[in-house]
Amino acid sequence: MDRRNFIIAGAAAIACGYGVGIALPKTRADELYLRPPGAVKNFESLCIKCGQCVQVCPYHSIDLLDIAQGYSNGTSYIDANKRGCYLCDLFPCVLACPSGALSHDTKVIGDVKMGVAILVDANACLAFKGESVSESGVKNLLDRKIYNDREQAVKDSIKVKIGSICDLCASLCPVGESAIIIQGNLPLIKQGCVGCGVCAEVCPPQVIKIVPNKTYDEIY
């Protein structure tokens, strides 16, 4: 059984658990989890836990929450520190969603409002310290299994930065300079940030985090 089928089968098994008296904690999932692009405000109630968005994501960015996440289990989310959202053309995850949990009005990057990035430890930032990207620092990214040309392109973009002063967060951002730039040897998050999480994924010291369901104005 491959990874995606395992996830979906697990979600089905979890759903069955409701019928046998499993007590699940309530959570504020809308505040805790980074959802795929196009997620509506009442995402948790509309998501039918079908896993279609997981199956079609070419970057393998989307997973399903497990039973430890309470009533949110089986719903789709993105762990940006493992794999951000690369904001694909046509948003296949949105097109695959049958329930309206991901709004089909999401057609261009400007429609996406997943959250906003924050720098949590400037002193550990490689750019701030004037340090180069090392092969060991991005080993986890380069060792990741590749399934398609898009993922290979990401790996190649990371590999060419080895030996250069780190600007991975800015150079790999799918939004571009309207979202993040390096200014004064530090990442500067700008109003164009949509919270895709790519900067968090590729940051070697993991000092960028995503605040889900918040806007730039709410954070900055």
Language-model regions: role of each:
Residues 1-220:
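Non-ligating segments of multi-cofactor redox enzymes
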